[in-house]
Amino acid sequence: MQPLRFLVLSPSGIKLDQAIISAQVKTTNGYLGLNYNRAPLIAAVQSHFCKILFANNTRRNAIIGAGLVLIKKTEAKIFTENFVFEDEIDLEATLKRKAELERQMNHSKDLKLNIKIEQNLMFELLKLSNKQR
């Protein structure tokens, strides 16, 4: 099977740039399988738990925040602010970040800021729920 170039891009840089066999991405219309030679597509991505099978046949799980996916025949790019591999989650830092986001939400009156805080809080909650499995 041909590998697909898989990139996860964020404002802080390239989080992942590797060849994969497949990955599952949750869009607003449901889950989407990524693999080589897929029809081009642009879709909104929801925060989700993602299973990735790399070209070297290793598997890793990741948590991807809300964003956008751009799919071409030979590559897929996800644009998001939040991405972390399951085995790299720091439980203590995640709990601190969650508490800080909850505090910010309780004190904010700005609707746009609250939406941003909610997206980041959702990502932290996904990390915590994944660690408890």
UniProtKB/Swiss-Prot annotation:
* Main location per the UniProt record: membrane
Any one annotated GO CC term: plasma membrane
Membrane topology according to the record: Peripheral membrane protein
Q: Which UniProt keywords apply?
A: ATP synthesis, Cell membrane, CF(1), Hydrogen ion transport, Ion transport, Membrane, Transport
Give the subcellular location. Answer: Cell membrane
Superkingdom of the source?
Bacteria
**A Pfam family reported for this protein in Swiss-Prot or TrEMBL:** ATP-synt_DE_N
Q: What would be an example GO MF term here? A: ATP binding
InterPro entries reported for this sequence: ATP_synth_F1_dsu/esu, ATP_synth_F1_dsu/esu_N, ATPsynth_dsu/esu_N
How does this chain assemble? F-type ATPases have 2 components, CF(1) - the catalytic core - and CF(0) - the membrane proton channel. CF(1) has five subunits: alpha(3), beta(3), gamma(1), delta(1), epsilon(1). CF(0) has three main subunits: a, b and c.
What is the similarity comment for this entry? Answer: Belongs to the ATPase epsilon chain family.
State its role. Answer: Produces ATP from ADP in the presence of a proton gradient across the membrane.
Protein name, entry field: ATP synthase epsilon chain
| Organism encoding this protein | Mycoplasma pneumoniae (strain ATCC 29342 / M129 / Subtype 1) (Mycoplasmoides pneumoniae)
